[in-house]
Amino acid sequence: MSDRGKCQYPDDVDVIREREYPLLKDTTYLDHAGTTLYAKSLIESFSRDLTSNLYGNPHSMSAPSQLSTQRVDDIRLRALRFFSADPEEFDLVFVANATAAIKLVADSFRESTPQGFWYGYHVDSHTSLVGARELAGIGSRCFVTDAEVESWISQLDTEPVQGPRLFAYPAQSNMNGRRFPRGWCGRIRESAKDTYTLLDVASLVSTSPFDLSDASAAPDFAVLSFYKIFGFPDLGALIVRKSAGHIFDKRKFFGGGTVDMVLTQGTQWHAKKQSSIHERLEDGTLPFHNIIALGSAFDTHERLFGSMDNISSHTRFLAKRLYDRMTTLRHYNGESVCHVYKPSHSDYTDPSTQGPILAFNLRSSQGAWIGKSEVEKMASVRNIQIRSGTLCNPGGTAASLNWSGADMLRHFGAGMRCGDDHDIMDGRPTGILRVSLGAMSNLTDIDTFMGFIEEFYVEKSPNVCALVPPLEANLTHRSGFHVESLSVYPIKSCGAFKVPDGKRWEIRREGLVWDREWCLIHQGTGTALNQKRYPRMALIRPFIDLSHGVLRVTCGSIRSPSQKTLEIPLDRENSNLTTTSLCQNSSKPSTVCGDQVIVQAYSSPTVSAFFSDFLGVPCTLARFPPQSSTRLAEPRRGLGSRKSPLRPAMPGAFPQDTPTPEAERNPILLSNESPILLISRSSVNRLNETIKSSPTTTNSTGRKKAVAADVFRANIVVAEDFPQPVSAGRPYIEDHWESLRIGPDNLHFNVLGSCQRCQMVCVDQLTGVRGEEPYSTLAKTRKSGNKIYFGRHLAISSNGDGNSVNSRTVMVGDVVTPSYYGP
């Protein structure tokens, strides 16, 4: 197995994957630092255990309870031995996760003395280690470099001691896999009294052995999460060096199972259990089923992989292969594609300095940074799972990106938040992309990921074609356009209602009447649901029945005999259908596209059950309040807007950056960004030609299929007056439109900019199935400034057509007359 490194698994890793990890069949999973994956046989083994044995609450004395106690004791000892920890020197406390273990230690230090404790932590720490500083009454310090830590250790014996000191750092950075000196723990203990170490080993233990056989060199406290190692169960541990156990003596809170006696009347007194550290700290009933599952996890892990040394060797080989390929990848002009964040002293062949994690960003041939969110979205479309952002490592990320504290505060003031898509600020990335490997990773994962980078982000020649092709001199004088179709989306992110041919439809400043007036909100969070997360929403199909004054909603396939129907009154005052009437007192905040919006939720259980049962999500219908509460669209700055990123490459193609106030803030209901979205049939046709001519991906079979225009969820589809042949069309000419007039009344519309696209366009609106097109092709053909564009945002003008607001209508077949950006 020379081509696969020094892997010594009992079976070939590809055989193990096929048998034990069927969910990896069509997925490339590269986020093992978040959690690794559980084996099929682990779940089967645990299931057999639960169905073969009766387990009771460990705090009882019955036979089932004593069986639980016995299993918990055995597995606790096995966990200690897994880390080569002598039970005479160490104890293991079961907790929810590594963060819970950190908090338990920090809380206990805070209560250990009246003045509290001093806390130091390395800048490359996980957020949870940083958070412990808020409990340090004496003060805290962030060590920015290893040299600062070394200097501090050398002076420990000369520093005045005001109380206990705790120094925390990761054994391995969860951001870039860099490994830290294990010797700090023993040296700190030797250098000063009343100074303790807290080692976060959660990232390390997923792919590497953690050896506590030398208690004198071990940390006083080590924290970890078992799901990082086994994928399941969701359980954590705090490993305590018994000589440091007195830190918990002053802990005030006590829970069930941690005391021998409690007086509740008269004198308030209790006696803590003293037989072990874990008995004093494991408050309440243990998650004994999870602990029992841990026993199955140990068995399965050893059977599949042999040892942690085997996993370390395997992942080290893969990480080195990936690192070499990423760092040698070049654009046509020799510029690097991948900027990898790795300390100069770390080496992917040396397990003492580096783990199997790669933190990086991508750059264009001209050195421009490529947005992390766009890369992650594109990877997700290709079923490649990676991580992006600050990676729960704020200090390490900021240091790698050279952001100061003042910079970060400025970004926060500008709206940047954890998990958002503010990818580039002040010309620099705000976050990092991360790929992390695990025990079941293989060379195919590496090849697939690198193929993805090469396909979408390696420039093989200069890009001489403008995204918006220049207008030909006579192009604007050729035949005109007409409205091919009109679509209203009454319920946000659900199916479309097609306006019938010959029916004139009212249009207001907020958009087409009834468009995005309703939404589905999660009953727990209040967040508006969308197809990105729930693609089956495409199968919720509303029909606007004006003659009966109802919104008629059906769910499921169009020809399904089991289709159910729900009717909602269009009139807010209509009380005929009491089971579906709007509850006027149910106004509640909801999050729509990042905005906090007040909506009115339907309180009827019938309404909630109708949607919840179909989607499998606890949700209900909500309606946007009357127009007095209308939202305002943010000004668009996309492709072809008045401030186009293409203007430097196309001088004179667009007017000056002087948007009108009307174009800046337009009223909308529950639409994402603007009142109206328009696309061109010619552009859809050209896109489909490109899709069908492109090669299929590794995971695809057969020829790529064209996509329907419906996937773009436009309100207006315009077509040219001579649809045949397709080659005679003018694709993407709408990118040059500044405004347009529609219909016999010459309704005037301002073009606000181009529509930025996300992976929601990959949801087939007829089946609710998510694919990879058209987003994959759009990413190659319609990208500008790290964003992908298709379609145009519109808003009806408040003047210029000579009609009152109430009489404005549009219809399929109406003539469309565009105005073009001037020279």
Swiss-Prot record:
Any GO molecular function: pyridoxal phosphate binding
Reactions this protein catalyses: Mo-molybdopterin + L-cysteine + AH2 = thio-Mo-molybdopterin + L-alanine + A + H2O
Entry EC number(s): 2.8.1.9
InterPro entries: Aminotrans_V_dom (IPR000192), MoCF_Sase_C (IPR005302), MoCo_sulfurase (IPR028886), MOCOS_middle (IPR005303), PyrdxlP-dep_Trfase (IPR015424), PyrdxlP-dep_Trfase_major (IPR015421)
SUPFAM superfamilies named among the record's database cross-references: MOSC N-terminal domain-like, PLP-dependent transferases
A single BP term in Gene Ontology: Mo-molybdopterin cofactor biosynthetic process
UniProt keywords, alphabetically: Molybdenum cofactor biosynthesis, Pyridoxal phosphate, Transferase
UniProt modified residues of type N6-(pyridoxal phosphate)lysine: 228
Domain of life: Eukaryota
PROSITE patterns cross-referenced by the UniProt entry: MOSC
Cofactor: pyridoxal 5'-phosphate
Chain segments carrying region Disordered: 628-667
Active site: 392
Gene3D superfamilies recorded: Type I PLP-dependent aspartate aminotransferase-like (Major domain)
Family named by the database record: Belongs to the class-V pyridoxal-phosphate-dependent aminotransferase family. MOCOS subfamily.
Protein name, UniProt field: Molybdenum cofactor sulfurase
Organism: Aspergillus niger (strain ATCC MYA-4892 / CBS 513.88 / FGSC A1513)
